[in-house]
UniProtKB/Swiss-Prot annotation:
Residues 16-94 form the GIY-YIG domain. Interacts with UvrB in an incision complex. The lineage of its organism: Bacteria, Pseudomonadati, Pseudomonadota, Gammaproteobacteria, Enterobacterales. Belongs to the UvrC family. One of its GO terms (biological process) is SOS response. CDD domains: GIY-YIG_UvrC_Cho. NCBIfam families: PRK00558.1-5 (NF001824), uvrC (TIGR00194). This is UvrABC system protein C. The gene is uvrC. GO terms for molecular function: DNA binding; excinuclease ABC activity.
């Protein structure tokens, strides 16, 4: 396996959805295309110690990059895999020269037609559906058809010599035309017609006919037959899942966008004649502070109005973003193409699902890109370089949360070389300060955290103070006054302040509470780890504050009632299902709680009411 391809890091980013994957060598050539019901499971199998074959070993040894395209159904993945193989001709895929070598599904012309896989010349009388990319795809489809439309798949030699139905009939996978009287000629012919329509991509017609038959059976009080047809309808719907292979012959590009950590991904899904031909993710360079709208508008303009891209303009473009110059863009594209080009940002129905697919792929590709480019270790290495430290093995970050100065909670989160160390996260209830005094709260939590003995392995290399210069000054004062046995000068104190509009990527960092701070580029791995730990600390503080506020809300009303101590409060809330249930209870209901007398129940009742 290539030293440059980090399979472990890549697999952490892969989804378990169905889709298609493309493997590239050092020259950027696609060397293998595959599909999977579960992308994560399938791709993981390539990086086991005991590979299945020498071919797989040779393939894996050349992998430099893997791209994935998520699909909503396995059928989509199959179609997309076929298109990619035809497009790239990867040397590790089985490449067949002409359609004679491709397998087909064969529907025979017998009195009772059968389904089978067929290769080679088409001499036998019947209908051929395909070609399919490989035998596995045909066998998979035949197994599916057998569950929904139970027509026979046995050889004629078996069919002609049966006196009683086989196991396939017993388990509902065949109607048993081999034995007279088990199925009528009309019913069998109807199921064959359903198969014919289904394999022709006309599943809507199949559903329409089945629904009509179900309604007729129901009106005739044939409820058992109606239930059987209902089950068949549900099976067809489950399989088709309203696949993104349009019968209307859509000719369009679908553009999904994802934006995170200063990086944008624009994923374009190419659809021609209603078929998904393929897709590609683009990662435009994004200057710091750029709005997402500018990223999208600039990309779309460059993509279609420059170079040779205009030669492949579709009839319609679906966008995941509402452009301010949508009309101008559409007019420009129409003029270049010499025909009407529509730009749509709020599609409905199937087209909205196309857009959802592009959006999903954009998010997946961006997650993978960010992870591959900046793992936690890489980010910490980058941070150490920025801070001029030999290494950063441990970071701690503090944040304060309160509501109008009440129920103040401070949080401390810890990162080590592998990222968040959640077992060591801590919350501190802040008391004895003036309401809303965040400086005093920060002073208190730092003294409680560091004013004691600390094991050498737990001394942080960096302490991040969320809040800017004022909070950093408090931290500096606390550490100057600490009288501890461990090296209090080892941790580097770093203040971080959000930009004026509090946008991620515009943070200012401070080494000292005086003077100017400095900023890092929005795509800097060092900034990403700072944002990560700061956001973790913020979420941890808010979570603790909400719990504290909820606890106060539930208990404060009871704490003022004489004779109701902690144990009785707990018992009352437990039996009544919370404070609201207790407020709605009668005196008699309250008196039934263990440990609550009639007199105390009346006191509780009137205290809560008044």
């Amino acid at each position: 396996m290539s030293d440059q391809f980090d399979a472990k890091a890549f697999l952490k980013t892969v989804t378990s959805q169905p889709g298609v994957y493309r493997m590239y060598d050092a020259g950027g050539t696609v060397i293998y295309v595959g599909k999977a019901k579960d992308l994560k499971k399938r791709l993981s199998s390539y990086f086991r110690s005991n590979l299945a074959s020498r071919k797989t070993e040779a393939l894996v040894a050349q992998i430099q990059q893997i791209d994935v395209t998520v699909t909503h159904t396995e059928t989509e993945a199959l179609l997309l895999e076929h298109n990619y193989i035809k497009l790239y001709q990867p040397r590790y895929n089985v490449l067949l020269r002409d359609d004679k070598s491709y397998p087909f599904i064969f529907l025979s012309g017998d009195t009772h037609p059968r389904l089978a896989m067929h290769r080679g010349a088409k001499h036998a009388k019947g209908e051929y559906f395909g070609p399919f990319p490989n035998g596995y795809a045909v066998r998979e489809t035949l197994a599916l058809l057998q569950k929904i439309f139970p027509i026979r798949q046995c050889e004629n030699s078996v069919y002609r010599n049966r006196s009683r139905p086989c196991l396939q009939y017993q388990i509902g996978r065949c109607l048993g035309p081999c034995v007279e009287g088990l199925v009528s000629e009309e019913e069998y012919a109807q199921q064959v017609e359903y198969v014919r329509l289904f394999l022709s991509g006309k599943d809507d017609q199949v559903l329409t006919q089945l629904i009509s038959r179900m309604e007729t059976a129901s009106q005739n009080l044939e409820f058992e037959e109606a239930a059987r047809i209902r089950d068949q309808i549900q099976a067809v719907r489950r399989v088709t899942e309203k696949q993104f292979v349009s019968n209307t012959g859509d000719d369009l590009d679908v553009i999904g966008v994802a934006f995170d950590a200063g990086m944008a991904c624009v994923h374009v899904l190419f659809i021609r004649q209603g078929k998904v031909l393929g897709s590609r993710s683009y990662f435009p360079k994004v200057p710091g502070g750029t709005e997402l709208s500018e990223v999208v508008e600039t990309f779309v303009g460059q993509f279609y109005l420059q170079g040779s891209q205009m030669r492949t303009l579709p009839g319609e473009i679906l966008l995941d973003f509402n452009l301010s110059d949508k009309t101008l863009l559409a007019d420009s594209l129409s003029e270049l193409a010499g025909r009407k080009i529509n730009v749509q940002t709020k599609p409905r129905g199937d087209r909205a699902r196309y857009l959802k697919l592009a959006r999903t792929n954009a998010a997946t590709a961006l997650t993978s890109k960010l992870s591959q480019q900046s793992t936690v270790h890489q980010r910490l290495t980058a941070l150490a370089s920025v801070l001029k430290l030999p290494e950063v093995k441990r970071m701690e970050c503090f944040d304060i949360s309160h509501t109008m100065g009440e129920q103040t909670v401070a949080s401390c989160v810890v990162f080590d070389a592998n990222g968040p160390l959640r077992a060591e996260y801590r919350r501190y209830n802040i008391t004895g300060i003036r309401p809303g005094d965040d400086y005093a709260a920060m002073n208190q939590v730092l003294r409680r955290r560091y004013g004691k003995a600390i094991d050498d392995s737990k001394i942080p290399d960096v302490i991040l103070i969320d809040g800017g210069k004022g909070q950093l000054a408090q931290a500096k004062n606390v550490f100057a006054e600490l009288d501890v046995s461990w090296d209090k000068n080892h941790p580097l104190l770093l203040g971080v302040a959000k930009g004026a509009d509090r946008k991620a990527g515009l943070e200012t960092l401070f080494f000292e509470p005086e003077g100017e701070g400095f900023s890092l580029p929005p795509d800097s791995p060092a900034l990403h780890v700072i944002q990560h730990i700061r956001d973790e600390s913020h979420d941890h503080a808010i979570g603790g504050h909400r719990k504290k506020r909820a606890k106060v809300k539930n208990t404060s009303s009871l704490e003022t009632i004489e004779g109701v101590g902690p144990k009785r409060r707990q018992m009352l809330l437990k039996y009544m299902g919370g404070l609201q249930g207790l407020r709605n209870a009668s005196v008699e209901e309250i008196a039934k709680v263990p440990g609550i007398s009639q007199g105390l129940a009346e006191k509780i009742f009137w205290s809560l009411k008044h």
